[in-house]
Swiss-Prot record:
Primary location class: cytoplasm
SUPFAM superfamilies reported for this sequence: Obg GTP-binding protein C-terminal domain, Obg GTP-binding protein N-terminal domain, P-loop containing nucleoside triphosphate hydrolases
Source organism of this protein record: Staphylococcus aureus (strain MRSA252)
Family per similarity comment: Belongs to the TRAFAC class OBG-HflX-like GTPase superfamily. OBG GTPase family.
Top-level taxonomic group: Bacteria
Keywords: Cytoplasm, GTP-binding, Hydrolase, Magnesium, Metal-binding, Nucleotide-binding
Designated name of the protein: GTPase Obg
Single GO biological process annotation from the record: ribosome biogenesis
Hydrolase keyword on record: yes
Length: 430
């Protein structure tokens, strides 16, 4: 089964909690704080495995949760960092944020990695908060929660050759006779609804990967007939083999088929118009094909080579394979994938600058309570142990230093009013 698109949920590991502890050795006077930091939570990492060809592994498991960091220990011992959760994907996988549709990573090369959900840092033990004014702090920090997000995985085939054309022109039949692939073949449209890959060897021992892509129809570039799902696989092929039913047995004119498919390719991605293309005139064993081929060549001109074949009698198949191998040899040093990525401004792995997170916003709930939100304050809230009075006092000091108290006063907050941060409620005290 070929799976080329799937949505999954990721949860990176939370950081381990720091602890509150003190030195109690017999001969160490004024032992002081000895609480260790928590370990780092595991990140969710995607890695390319060239042995994979589909996203089938993600079809049956859609939720992935990485491990939590180990809590800190006494004697200033740091908790163990959790090992990253590594998910293997095939070459050509694009990872997008479902909520924003932002491309997070474009993984092409074997062994290439991308951290998509970052693990939380470990909370600090009470040793970290010791100061001359407070040499024995009796509070510590909870671990930072790991990132959580939904992503979509899209696989663009990394085939050398892509077979394109209208439904029922013989693409699957060709792939089945030149490789060991066993695509579904039937006398009806859209027998192929998922791409099929096959390794092809020519009589002179050259080889390449060929993809049989589902049939295109007019309007495919606008998404008609699942066109977007099919066309995205063409983008990474080096050579397009454009197959045409020269017999006109489906009631279509061969020249119109040729024009429509090329228009759809260009409309979807302008660069596909300049991609090396080999035109294959199939079904030459049928009576009308010879006359149609003459008219077809007159219409498109001598600049476009046409190779007549019959996938039923297998006439001229070897000549077609030689032509494909020659064309691949001619363009072997051209990397169409890189050009496309640069043209749309996509980095293979997205590394973003994280701006200052000190900004916050204040709003009002229907019951009149003040709601404070912002990355920094919410992060501090999650890492504060509210069962510890000293930790609560530290949280209050942090709010003051960020200017939240002054901002609440400016919004009209008075003594005794309710202030909410995430799921917590506080009473504003002057």
């Amino acid at each position: 089964m070929f799976v080329d698109q799937v949505k999954i949920s990721l949860k990176a590991g939370d950081g381990g909690n720091g602890i509150t502890a003190y030195r109690r050795e017999k001969y160490v006077p004024f032992g002081g704080p000895a609480g260790g930091d928590g370990g780092k939570g595991a990140s969710v990492v995607f890695e390319v495995d060239e042995g994979l060809r589909t996203l089938l592994d993600f079809r049956y498991q859609r939720h992935f949760k990485a491990s939590k960091g180990e809590n800190g220990q006494s004697s200033n011992m740091h908790g163990k960092n959790a090992e990253d959760l590594v998910l293997k994907v095939p070459p050509g996988t694009i990872i997008k944020n479902v909520e924003t549709d932002e491309v997070l990573a474009d993984l092409v090369e074997d062994g290439q990695r991308a951290v998509v959900a970052k693990g939380g840092r470990g909370g600090r033990g009470n040793s970290r908060f010791a100061t001359p004014r407070n040499p024995a702090p009796d509070f510590s920090e909870k671990g930072e929660p790991g990132e959580e997000l939904d992503v979509s995985l899209e696989l663009k085939l990394l085939a050398d050759v892509g077979l394109v054309g209208f439904p029922s022109v013989g693409k699957s039949t060709l792939l089945s006779i030149v490789s060991k692939a066993k695509p579904k073949i039937g006398a009806y449209h859209f027998t192929t609804i998922k791409p099929n890959l096959g390794v092809v060897s020519t009589p002179d021992q050259r080889s390449f990967v060929m993809a049989d892509l589902p049939g295109l129809i007019e309007g495919a570039s606008d998404g008609v007939g699942l066109g977007h799902q099919f066309l995205r696989h063409v983008e990474r092929t080096k050579v397009i083999v454009h197959m045409i039913d020269m017999s006109g047995s489906e009631g279509r004119e061969p020249i119109e088929d040729y024009k429509v498919i090329n228009q759809e390719l260009a409309a979807y991605e302008q660069r596909l118009e300049d991609r090396p293309q080999i035109v294959v005139a199939n079904k030459m064993d049928l009576p009308e094909s010879q006359d149609n081929l003459i008219l077809f060549k007159e219409e498109i001109g001598e600049d476009v080579p046409v190779i007549p074949v019959s996938t039923i009698t297998r006439d001229n198949i070897d000549q077609l394979l030689y032509a494909i191998a020659d064309k691949l040899e001619e363009y072997k040093d051209v990397d169409f994938t890189v050009e496309e990525e640069e043209s749309v401004g996509i980095n293979r792995v997205l590394y973003k600058h994280t701006p200052s997170q000190d900004k916050f916003t204040i709003s009002r709930d229907d019951d009149g309570a003040y709601v404070v939100s912002g990355n920094a304050i919410e992060r501090m809230f999650k890492m504060t142990d509210f069962n510890s009075d000293p930790a609560v006092r530290r949280f209050a000091r942090q709010m003051r230093s960020m200017g939240i108290d002054d901002a609440l006063r400016e919004r009209g907050c008075k003594n005794g009013d309710i202030v909410r941060i995430l799921g917590g409620e506080f009473e504003f005290v002057e």
